[in-house]
Amino acid sequence: MVLKSILLALFVLAGAVTPQAAAAEMALETFENDPASRWQFFTDGVMGGVSSGELTFEEAAGNVHARMTGEVSTANNGGFIQMRTDALGAPRVEATGVRLVMRGSNGPYYVHVRTSNTRLPWQFYQAGFNVTPAWSEVRLPFDAFKARGGLLRAGLKPQSIASVAIAAYGRDHGVEIEIREIGFY
């Protein structure tokens, strides 16, 4: 009888998991527990550009967030700064896109996704988003990501995702963006 009750309770609880709840369990970065070990900062200086900036991790109102600031310059064939991680891994099969909770100014900004098939540094899939001064959520469906850098398949294959980056890209501008959460939905 006790075993039946336990099995019934487990069955009821399993049925209570909604698709939204399952999606919430997908890979999610909240920038806690040593985020500097999972995130790297890059500029176009690796290829001769002159953009500059920094990535810091800050706490405000009980939430840790990443803060990327700097200046993007297209001089000397440059034009980007970015923060990148490979810690999210590939999304689960049912994932449909990338979700961010962010704020900032001087957008647009971009999510750059690299896959197991992006071999050259200038190859990635890109989707843009705008920012506001207040914390807000943006959802970027996988089909919004476009191949950049040549020699890539036209559509992003989500299960081949190897890294995710937030990038300030392609135009001269000051950068100020904060990310509180990033993951798949």
Label for each model-derived stretch:
Residues 19-185:
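Beta-rich carbohydrate-recognition modules and glycan-binding surfaces
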Residues 1-7:
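Bacterial N-terminal signal peptides that target proteins for export
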Residues 8-16:
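Bacterial N-terminal signal peptides
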